[in-house]
A protein has these predicted regions:
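Carbohydrate-binding surfaces of carbohydrate-active enzymes
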Residues: 1-133, 144-149, 225-227
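Short beta-strands within extracellular/lumenal beta-sheet-rich domains
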Residues: 39-48, 157-168, 204-206
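Helix N-cap / beta->alpha transition motif
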Residues: 72, 190, 207-209
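A short acidic/small-residue loop/turn micro-motif
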Residues: 77-84, 195-203
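Short, surface-exposed tryptophan/glycine-enriched loops
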Residues: 85-96, 163, 168-170, 205-217
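Terminal leader/tail segments of proteins
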Residues: 206-242
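Compositionally biased low-complexity segments at domain edges in trafficked proteins
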Residues: 127-170
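Aromatic-lined ligand-binding clefts that engage carbohydrates, nucleic acids, or primary amines
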Residues: 55-70, 97, 167-190, 197-198, ...
């Protein structure tokens, strides 16, 4: 089935959707997500940048674990612990920079367990000039009530967003949701959170227990961080691995 082309961009959530997804933003000089009072999930980092030369290099000193990079609402790419810099395809002038960071998990062994900070921390530079005056906002994606989200038609494919769709079944049974082709995010069925997906791992399906399914129409909400614009989700009778 294909989720309807109705999306709710994160930047519009406070106005369009449940306020439970965001907490108050804060101006910070440090960048760990624990400063926001959260230990897991997503955080949005925002700053105004001045570009003096086209295609500047954005670099971060430390990141755990992953962040999507947007400039003026357009996806530029991703930064990770293994790839800490990215060339921005932008013109000269003033632009709005957004970094959507996620804590994928926690280390449970080894020396790094003593300092397992998450988010972006240390210096963040544009062409070796440190970016200041950051605003951080916790995004309580997994804790939100997706049944309260208000969707509006949107044709552009830019910022991270929620998709919604429906499928129909005759008899509820244990099945799997195939997220092949999607980038990174979370899924709910009938308002119940069922799990996350990431294109970088071999698992392509999320188990769906019969207990949360209904005979007839069932509702699906997908949060997509990387916005691969896939828009197609399939049901499967078995787990799928690459």
């Amino acid at each position: 089935f294909i989720p309807s082309a109705y999306r709710s961009r994160i930047i519009c959530i406070p106005r369009l959707c449940s306020s439970s997804i965001t907490r108050s933003s804060m101006e910070v000089s440090g960048y760990c997500i624990r400063l926001l009072g959260i230990e897991f999930g997503y955080a949005l980092y925002e700053a105004e940048i001045t570009v003096e030369d086209v295609d500047p290099i954005l670099a971060v000193e430390n990141i755990r674990d992953y962040a999507s990079v947007y400039v003026d609402g357009r996806l530029q790419g991703w930064i990770t612990d293994n790839q800490k810099n990215i060339k921005l395809t932008v013109s000269t002038g003033t632009h709005h920079l957004q970094l959507y960071a996620e804590n994928i998990g926690r280390i449970t062994y080894g020396p790094e367990i003593l300092d397992n900070s998450k988010g972006l921390f240390g210096s963040i530079t544009l062409e070796d000039v440190e970016i200041e005056n950051w605003k951080m906002t916790p995004l309580l994606i997994r804790d939100c009530d997706v049944e309260e989200l208000q969707f509006t038609p949107c044709q552009t494919k830019q910022s991270p967003c929620f998709y919604r769709g429906t499928f129909e079944i005759e008899t509820p049974t244990d099945i799997f949701l195939d997220t092949s082709g999607w980038g990174m995010g979370e899924v709910w069925i009938n308002g119940q959170y069922i799990g996350s997906f990431w294109e970088n791992i071999s698992q392509r399906t999320i188990p769906v227990p019969a207990a949360i399914l209904a005979k007839g129409i069932n509702r699906v909400v997908v949060f997509e961080l990387k916005n691969n614009c896939r828009q197609v989700v399939r049901l499967s009778e078995k787990a799928i691995f690459d």
